[in-house]
């Protein structure tokens, strides 16, 4: 047991009380630390805290199958040492591995098995550093600073803002004036006639019923204001020249 030298706290689990004190003293001398003693049949009733021992030595290991509890009782990197076992070592090693122990090995000459608890506490977790953190973009958040607005002043050019020059209006190719000749064939005569028919009069039309200003719902069938929006009484309304002429 020289390989256990320097371990501070050990647990010796026994099955045979004969020469028990001698075996405990041998373990204490080998480790140089404190040694607790527990019967293998009382192990399931014991109340040892987790990570209590650096070394657990158990004899006649086939008498217990509570290796998971032994794993919790050991400190990280603690050692489980079994000796005087009976039966094939392969099945016992497999059972120990399935309980969570690592580095399980057999010494056929000394008829012993040794295993270790991993270097971390049972149930512990660690953050993985290789995971890439993906930044989530909040697509529902719209910032006014990021939105490109169209400048209204850029929609119109300087030419669009200038008023049309009367001198640039269409004129007769014969007279050179905005007046159609007698036998006009360029279309100016029709254009001037269209402007004349759409010219509005400034005088108010006379109402016979007095309800013309209320809207079409209150106007008669021959009302010259049909189709026009309602207006205030006394308000001057301009009608096209052809609306004041009789159709007959």
Curated annotation (Swiss-Prot):
Gene3D superfamilies: Vaccinia Virus protein VP39. Its main location: cytoplasm. [4Fe-4S] cluster binds at residues 209, 212, 220, 223. One of its GO terms (molecular function) is electron transfer activity. Its cofactor is [2Fe-2S] cluster; [4Fe-4S] cluster. Keywords: 2Fe-2S, 4Fe-4S, Cytoplasm, Iron, Iron-sulfur, Metal-binding, Mitochondrion. GO terms for cellular component: mitochondrial intermembrane space. One of its GO terms (biological process) is iron-sulfur cluster assembly. A motif (Cx2C motif 2) lies at residues 220-223. Residues 4-130 are annotated as: N-terminal SAM-like domain. The C-terminal domain binds 2 Fe-S clusters but is otherwise mostly in an intrinsically disordered conformation. Monomer. This is Anamorsin homolog. It comes from Drosophila virilis (Fruit fly). The lineage of its organism: Eukaryota, Metazoa, Ecdysozoa, Arthropoda, Hexapoda.
